[in-house]
Amino acid sequence: SSYGVTYVKDESELLDALEIAFECDEKALVEERLVGTEITVGVLGDPPRALPIVEILPQEGSEFYDLDVKYIDPTLVHRIPAAISPKDYHRAEEYAVAAHEALGCKGFSRSDFIVGEHGTTILETNTIPGMTDTSLFPDEARHAGIPFSAVCDELIHIALEGAEE
C-alpha cells in the first residue's frame, strides 16, 4: 500500500527517504524510477483471466500513486480501458496472468506496470488486492460486466474447491 515509499529526485534526498523506509521495515529497496504510463491489471478466476486494464492518471501534487492518493484522498482519477497501444495492452494482460500463475495465486490478484519507451515492466503483483469502494480491482470487474457480488461468489467457489482438494 505504498507505506514507506518515497520518490527522490536526487541523491541528497536519499538518506531521508531511507529513514522513512526503515520506520516500516528493517529492509529497504531502492529502485530507479521508470517513466511512462502507470497501469494495473486485475486477474480473476480459475482458469485466470485478465480484467479490463486501468490507467492511473497522474494527480497534481503527487509524484506517484502513493498512500495519500490511495486512501487519504481517494479521488483517484483513472481510465478504463487504459489508453495504451493494443500491443502493450495484450502484453500487460499476458504478463499479469503469467505472474498470477507463477506466484501460485488463487482466485484473484492485481499486477502493476509502467508502460514506456523501455517496454512494459511489471512493478509488483498484489496477491490480495484491495476490495473497498475505492479499490481498483472491483472497478475493473464492473467494467468487465461482473458485479461485486459475483466477484465474491466466484472467489468463495474457488476457495471451497481448494478446500475439498
Locate predicted features.
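Phosphate/diphosphate-binding glycine-rich loops and adjacent basic-rich segments that engage nucleotide
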Residues: 1-9, 17
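Short beta->alpha junction loops/turns
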Residues: 10-11, 46, 108, 130
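Short beta-strand-to-turn element immediately C-terminal to the catalytic PLP-Schiff-base lysine
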Residues: 6-10, 43-46, 116, 123, ...
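Phosphate-binding site of ATP-dependent enzymes
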Residues: 11-94, 121
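Glycine- and other small-residue-rich loops at beta-strand/loop junctions that grip anionic moieties
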Residues: 6, 31-32, 111
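Gly/Ser/Thr-rich beta-alpha loop segments that engage phosphate groups in nucleotides
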Residues: 6, 38, 131-132
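ATP-dependent carboxylate activation and anion-phosphoryl transfer catalytic cores
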Residues: 85-165
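Short, flexible active-site loop motifs that bind/organize anionic cofactors or intermediates
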Residues: 3-4, 79, 141
